[in-house]
């Protein structure tokens, strides 16, 4: 197979995904197009050489519908020959977009492609796309569906992570994110977002709360307790996992990923097009893997996917110096570290989505750029 290189990564700062957030007035199309323009301008790209643009988006409806990737290439003034496609693999969408772009280059069907994602959670809220799990009781019943927040609480209950454990992890995420910004670790990848007048509206991650403490988090109420008790989701979880005595609802707004707006792009290509265009590779992609996990607990999947990818690449855990895992909920990362025996000092060293936020379709490409 052809070697594939990462030539550049860019992302927006993450804006609070609320009407008062700095990016609320910026449409998802503008977010995506601005990052495509940045990739082009930073690398002096002849965009006719880009074979495809693949974007993750978890709520591909409304302003994010109608194949936002293709339209964004046109809005970014890319050559009309550049194709575009939107994909949805939930929170892995941005990473899967990069994987798909990589696969096209690996197999020789493309020389250069862009993978990334976009999500304006303030303008197109979670759940806007509906779906059978949320609307068809027969589907939810057959698959033992529960919302992800309760899945995270199930993980905490099954493996004994206390409220103090998850809160302590969240505080460390905030500290690491703040330190990373202070040390300008993101300066090469974060591109400020501009309004239609060309004025920069945001140039830093808006969601961070570096002043948070264990004491301040202790005052937050669990986010999923009422839902679990009143809508039968706790009973569903316990039916599927009878070894768990009860669901301890330990997750709340302070130790879960933040709702934010943002976009990200990753430029990948083979060696020959990089040399022809004068590009310097930042990294080589050895391989990737996907896996489906049991859908009730679902959030244990990352460790299985990581192990599968290591096997495919002929590598061991000891070969990995730094790990990045989306901080959807604190217990997810705690379980990943325990399952793979990873030291906390080797994972999410720049902070993560608990501190900086999780723009659903874009985060996977964002954390790849961080790594």
Task: Please give the residue ranges for each predicted region.
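Conserved beta-strand-centric core segments of catalytic alpha/beta enzyme folds
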Residues: 1-34, 93, 97-129, 136-148, ...
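Conserved catalytic cysteine-centered active-site region
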Residues: 57-110, 143-150, 218-258, 339-371
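Conserved beta-ketoacyl condensing-enzyme motif
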Residues: 22-113, 118-134, 190-203, 296, ...
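Glycine- and Gly-Pro-enriched alpha-helical subdomains that act as flexible
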Residues: 269-319, 337
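Short, well-ordered amphipathic alpha-helical segments that serve as non-catalytic structural scaffolds
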Residues: 28-44, 68-72, 97, 149-155, ...
